[in-house]
Amino acid sequence: MTEDELQTYVVHWLQVALPLGSVFHHSPNEGKRHVAYKMRLKKLGMAAGWPDLEIFVPETGWRDPADQGPIMVELKRPKGGSLSANQKDIQERLKCCGVYCVTAKRLAHVEAYLKPLLHLRGTSQADIIRQMCEA
């Protein structure tokens, strides 16, 4: 499975499993680009190594309201995927700012990380997506 395929499953799962009122976003900062375009994006604030998904959850979605904060998810392909030096640096800096960060190679890793923090919705759609991803 590619990282893009994994992210597609994770996005579909988040849409049906996150607490109501949650929002998430993907900043398309991966891939090869023309040098001039990369420079433009950098001027606009793009940071190399930024996680794949940013998740924001309303207060009522947290198991412990004291745990509130942004959640960042970095996805890696299941076989051979590893964090770059920029990604490691960004994750450490985000953690110092009180941001939850996880690196995951499977949907099950994302779910296991979020389950103790959030009131996830248990839906049949979430179950189907999980089964499809793990197949």
Which residues make up each language-model segment?
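Catalytic phosphate/metal-binding cores of nucleic-acid and nucleotide-processing enzymes, i.e., regions
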Residues: 1-135
